[in-house]
Amino acid sequence: MFTQKCPLILASGSPRRKEILTTMGLSFSVDVSDADESFAGTPEEMVLELSRRKAQAVAQRHSGAIILAADTLVFGDEVLGKPHSAGEARRMLAGLSNRWHSVYTGVTMIDTRSGSVLSRADETRVHFIAMTEEDIDAYVATGEPLDKAGAYGIQGRGGMFIDRIEGSYSNVVGLPMALVRGMLLELEKAQI
C-alpha cells in the first residue's frame, strides 16, 4: 500500500480528479497548470504529452513534492475534447450515439525530490446506446456536457446513455485509480 511521505500536488482544477484522489484516501493540494495544451498526434501521444507539460509547469513551483497531472480525451472518428458550445456538444453526442469510442487519460507524476518522471496512459472503451435528437437536446440543456471531454459525464446523467465499458471506469471519469496507485508505489520504491 502507498504510504504518503511527501506532499502531493494535483496539477488540475478538475472536481472529478479531486474527488477520485479523495476517494483514494490521499491528501493533496491543487496548483492548476497553465501549460500550453496544443499538440497533434495519436490520442495516446496527445494525452501523454499534455500531462507531461502540465506536470512540468507545476513542478517548477514546488520542491519536495510529487506532482500529478492528467489529460483526458475521447476518440471516436476524431479527437473530442471539451465542447466550446451547446451546438458542438450536440454534434459530439450525435457522433457517439450507438457506437464504441475510446477514452484516453495520460498521467504524469514528477517527484521533485529526485527528479523522477513517470508517464503512463490508460484506454477505456465505451459504448453508447442509440440516442434520439430529443435525448441529446435534453441532455445538453442540463449543461453537464459543456465541461467534459466528449461532451458527457459517465458519473452523471450521461451515464444513462452508456450500456457497456471495457476498462477502467475511473479513467472515463478523468483519473484511472489503479494506474495512479501503481505509479505512486513505483515512485515510493524509487525513494527507498
Language-model segments: residues:
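N-terminal beta1-alpha1 ligand-phosphate binding loop
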Residues: 2-26
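Short, glycine/serine-rich, charged loops/turns that create anion-binding
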Residues: 15, 35, 114
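A short beta-strand-loop structural module common to alpha/beta enzyme folds
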Residues: 29-37
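Anionic-ligand binding patches
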Residues: 2-9, 41-192
